[in-house]
Each structure stands twice: as structure tokens, then as C-alpha cells.
Amino acid sequence: MSASKIPLFKMKDLILILCLLEMSFAVPFFPQQSGTPGMASLSLETMRQLGSLQRLNTLSQYSRYGFGKSFNSLWMHGLLPPHSSLPWMRPREHETQQYEYSLPVHPPPLPSQPSLKPQQPGLKPFLQSAAATTNQATALKEALQPPIHLGHLPLQEGELPLVQQQVAPSDKPPKPELPGVDFADPQGPSLPGMDFPDPQGPSLPGLDFADPQGSTIFQIARLISHGPMPQNKQSPLYPGMLYVPFGANQLNAPARLGIMSSEEVAGGREDPMAYGAMFPGFGGMRPGFEGMPHNPAMGGDFTLEFDSPVAATKGPENEEGGAQGSPMPEANPDNLENPAFLTELEPAPHAGLLALPKDDIPGLPRSPSGKMKGLPSVTPAAADPLMTPELADVYRTYDADMTTSVDFQEEATMDTTMAPNSLQTSMPGNKAQEPEMMHDAWHFQEP
């Protein structure tokens, strides 16, 4: 019995495994997006689902580069060619573009330049002479008898007032006399009216003048009807605007590389700044290139580093030695030789302020050498370490009870919620008097 039951259970297990395999092949674990196969094509709805700037608080599973850094695309890893060559970025004719980037609907034709057919019944909005010339041009086009006009108009010069008085009330049966009648009709009683038909006798200058005018009016009307068409060829090259801000976050990777439509950037510059106050690595997710900080030294977590180019060459053991406050002369090479280094340090977190790390201050531009621009110089040790009265009104201040050396202030490994208690920088001569153990209530002590 047991020998016969074992293959039966094996068969049942095999059937179960096969059923599970069939189900696993049927259920799409990795659903294919609609688009060009093999390309990372994302529609606007998918980008909205992946996360937008209005949903920053959700910790994104699509990104390992920070808090709200959803949708890090393949451009970051260099796996995709630039977007100009991607077929899903090219415009498709049947696709409806976004409203803010599509050109407006064809405007109605201007009242001064419509097509010539509705001009003839009402001549009120136009000058009489211009209406008469266009009327004559259309009537001559309808008549199509230029040799008859060349013969007839000089013969009828003397009888023009009589013909005008006789033919005007009738329903225009004689076609050759129609241009002369219509032209002299508004200007019959006046002398310029008699002067105008005289050069029209040979009628060549009149014809040569009226025909291009009518054709230009037709061309203008045609251009109005087809108004924004040549620009429509170039407008959908970028269906959604491309925001590529390079911001410094915790790993100093590009903060967000991808296609963002303008509807998803409603927050703009204001919304991420609240997160910049909470998380110091979160500066600079903004649709622009101008305010992005650039970290010269690749920083891991929230570590204060020097802003000088020497920081890129220092090893981590020097940083640890400086962080423990031991008097190491090689840990701070700028201190003795370059006293002007004090003027480059950042004085922004005053005594007791909850401060952002040095390299992640969001709004300040940098010079090409990596130095902060727009910061005031450090107050020397003899000056008042407290804040300005405006800052003291806003923030609660604490006493600066001890002087901290520059390398300790700059290189202390800092928790996200802690700040150095004293930012009063000591002069370079104080290096020998540095204490081995820093008794500071605002730092976590190592055991």
C-alpha cells in the first residue's frame, strides 16, 4: 500500500506544482506598460501613480535616494539614450497634447480681413474706395471679358453718368458695364468719381492693381484660417515639460530625473522646503537649475564637512579623529596655514539653533570651487556669539557656554535632530587647549 501511495502523492504534488506554475505564468507579476516594447514608456497617468510633488510624505518604494524621490528613471543609471532619440517622446499626431502647451484653437477671422464673399452684401465697415476696388476685382473675375472692357470702357466714358442713373435701379443685366457702374456708384456726384474712371479706361493698371490685392486678401484669409499650423509641427516635441533638477541629497545622487508634466509640479518651490527643515538631505527638489547645491565631497549620512576643496581629499579616518575632538594637526590642514578659511565657514546655525548640515542648505548657490556664495563672514571669538535680534525673536536661543574649535564644529557627526550647542569658533591658537572629551548636552555622547 505504501509503495502504491507514494507515486500517487508525488503525482498530486506534481499536478499542484504545475497548476501553480500555470497560474504564475497567467498572472502578470510584472505588467507591461502600454507603449513601445523594450522602452521605458510611461504615460502621464502612470507618472501620477508613481508619485508626484503633491504626495511627498509617502515614503516611495521606487527610490533608494531619499524621501520623496519617487520615479528615478533609467536616465540616472545611464541605461537610456537621451530623450530626443526615444520614440515614445516623439510627437504622435492622434495624441491630445496637454492644454497648457498646446496652441490655442484657430482664432476667428478678424473683422477687417474675412473672406471676400460676405464682403459684398454689407459695405458699411469698409472704406468705400477699397470696397469699390475689391468689388470691381471680383466683378471682373466673374465677367472674364478683359478685351471687351478694353474696347467698351473708352466708348462709355462720356455716357457714364447717364448709364449710372439708368442701370443702378435695375438688376444688373449688362455684364460689361457692371464694374464701371459699381465703381462710380458711391462717387457719382463728386468730381473724384469722374476722375477715377478715366485711368480705368485702358483698365490695365486697374486690373493689375486689383488682382494682386484680391489675391493677397485671399492669402491673408487663408493664412488666418490655417493660422497656427506651421508652429503646430514643432510644439509637441516635448509633450510634457522635462524638469531635470540635480539636487544634493543623502547620497548626492541626482534628486529627480524624469518626465514630469506641469500639472504635477503644483507645489513648485514652496512645498519641499518644509521637508528641507525636517530632513537635512532633502534640499533641492525644485523645477530649476539655479538654486541647486552641489556637494564637492560625496557624503554618506548627515556628516558636516568642509566646504573647501581639501575636503574631497581627506580620508574618513581624519574625519573621525576630528569628530572626537582629539588634537590632530593633519585633520585640519586649513586651520594654521590659512586663517582666511574662517571667513569661508558658514555661520548660519547660531548658538542653539536647529541647523541644516553645511552642504545641504537648499537655497544658496555655489561658486565653481564649491564655496557657498551669499553667506556673511564668521564672527570672531571676541564678538557677541548670540544672534541678531530678529533671529532671537523668532527662535529660542541657548547660551554659548564653551568655544568649539573649527574642525570639531565642521566635522562632528550630527544626528538629524541635534545641533552643536556653541557655534562660537575659536581662533587658530586654541588648538593645544582642546579638551579630549566634549561635554555637550546637544550631542549624543559615545559610551
From Swiss-Prot:
Gene Ontology BP term (one): cell adhesion
Residues recorded as bearing Hydroxyproline in the entry: P37
Residue numbers spanned by region Disordered: 165-211, 307-338, 353-383
Effect of H439R: In an ameloblastoma sample
Superkingdom as given in the UniProt entry: Eukaryota
GO cellular component, one term: endoplasmic reticulum lumen
Membership in a protein family: Belongs to the ameloblastin family.
Name the UniProt record assigns to this protein: Ameloblastin
Organism encoding this protein: Homo sapiens (Human)
